[in-house]
């Protein structure tokens, strides 16, 4: 019997995770992730490139061609289209086939990765390809102490990835690569705890954030994530909406070098061409990219919670166009609102930003209160949503989503209490599609729903010292048991009567015992 796509996916996931654990040996999975993910990426770009060269002609098998038949024109055209070049001898399938007997495997892999990256030098794709394999260190002692040990471990990784049934490019099953990559990242993140949560937003939460940012837009110029992580949030927008809706592609900035490379690989693995994405490395708050690319019609982000930043120690930042309008900087110990103000500055007049936030920023005083006042007074806050606890990797905190808009049609602020909308899984809670649909329905309608949603007048928020905590406006359902006092009194009367009767019975027994003792 033929397996369904769901069964195929489940089997593929089981197989991938087993391979990932088998090949790492005693090395921690978190430390070894770049080899498994890197090998999967290497296989993807090899097959993707072969498919491009063959162009549907069954008489051509690029992997079997000799490198010498490649002309400069073929190479030039390919790099302009795909962004990189891979010779037949450098393809994953050819390297993996000889991996177990290749005494120079680690050196050969390094040379191939250098060649792929250098093929883009001088082309528009150079920045998108440069350093992609930097974390696939073929000389690392994580692979083993000797060259022989390193080669054996590398061969195991290549053979494992080679064995994955990811379909054929001619069968249009490209998404299986992206799905496999996302599954691996998700599992690595789940097992890494806090450090994993910093680079991956679970798909179910990403889906909600993407829908919030894209709601009501028939098309957006481009989508942006100022704390891109592994790119999972940006890619949810691609999965949720047709390609033509996002016209100019995907933009993001990431501070961690390894995660930055994972994000770029993730884009390729989801079949986003180099000219449709731009992921930059650097500190978004102090070294922001894409000033010339803004404004963005859709912004999604799950920035790190309450991280330290330079803040007021850098006197130039208060005059930065991103922060100056608020008249105050986010506290040095809590950069949350710095990310919010950055996103607001990059947002277009027709766009929305959906940002995951630590709940404390919505009620604390000081600079954070002043920033809330700026946001509310200028009517930028569309909705604040409180989520259930334990939805994210590495933290059990119940976080909020802040939705910013520059095109509101009224001055109310909507509050949604989604803290009871979750399904309990083994280690984490999840949002089901039904939960997301329910949140989106009340978000779109702006209707008041008891214990779930309330749209609050601007004056009320002002009178409440610009407190934006959902619990201040949406009354939680009283889950305490309702007690019938009359019924309780009746039960109490019956119980007292029984106690009185028992006392009389006990007194009678005692009197009888004492009478017997007197007779003796």
Protein language model regions, located:
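A structure-centric signal for secondary-structure junctions around beta-strands
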Residues: 36, 177, 220, 247, ...
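A conserved structural/catalytic subdomain of Rossmann-like adenosyl-cofactor enzymes
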Residues: 2, 7, 287, 293-520
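Glycine-rich, flexible loop segments associated with nucleotide phosphate handling
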Residues: 176, 223, 333
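Conserved S-adenosyl-L-methionine
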Residues: 195-301, 306-308, 313-317, 322-327, ...
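Non-catalytic, mostly N-terminal accessory regions of nucleic-acid modification and defense proteins
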Residues: 1-208, 212-213, 217, 275-284, ...
